[in-house]
């Protein structure tokens, strides 16, 4: 494991105080990637030349005290089912092995405007269908804590690069746990935002009514910073909404704990950790109340009806595409 990378706020402080340059940080994470990738295979492609160029532009902004904000100069990795103009988006599939994106996903546009530096595209289970990142056409990703273990999936590459220190943060996509589960396996923070709060424009769909793009980071505060940058209404996504957030400050709030998620099937260790947080919140004066959603037990069954139906419809559009497969290969497949 590489030396732990500071939080985004701390990095920004180092930049502002001229104690570190964005180009130095980029070189650091690239060096980490260069000696971990042979084992982990978390990045499918690294953007060294472009990243170094943009990081030096960020250097100049900080020198002139004209930084674009907290994310200016921060190296972030992007899951390879999210489009970046001019780069391949393969979804870890041979079907899209030659597809070069002609446009940016909305989240990518937002991060570019914030001065983010992209480290590269990360590995995933093919078309984001899987939970181990073993089912990639380009080979499996390993867990940075122990290469004999899987990193989870489908955003296993995005979780692994953050855990290994070859990116400060990353974006993944989550349909039924594909950000949260690999983040847990790799010991980092994964967040699936509320559906509609982050635009899906430019995300190659798995199940359109369940997919959501979200951040994987080292800290909860880093997650907040990235989410604030990528959230918001987008006219290019018909399911996009305008989020309404309430600033809590030090207000006392009422918090529900879902009874059905604190029962059989949830490990004692997990329940104990949740209970520690519950006790802390109570000590702070918040009202923590047990609530019940009886239909929770049906959620997995409903997921396995919706997800296969929608992914079948979404993936059928690639059947006659010439994005990747040469005619000779197509003849072999027929």
Say what each PLM segment does.
Residues 71-91, 250-258, 306-334:
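Short helix-loop capping/hinge segments that flank enzyme active sites or metal/cofactor-binding pockets
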Residues 192-272, 330-334:
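A short helix-breaking turn/cap at a secondary-structure junction
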Residues 1-53, 283-285:
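An N-terminal boundary/leader segment
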Residues 103-105, 109-230:
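Short glycine/serine-rich loop segments
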Residues 22-27, 56-59, 267-293, 325-329:
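Acyltransferase
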Residues 29, 51, 104, 223, ...:
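Residue-level signal for inorganic ion chemistry
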Residues 41-46, 238, 253-254, 258-261, ...:
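Flexible, acidic loop-helix segments that line cofactor/substrate-binding pockets
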Residues 51-53, 61-136:
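Acidic/His- and Gly-rich active-site-bordering loop/insert found
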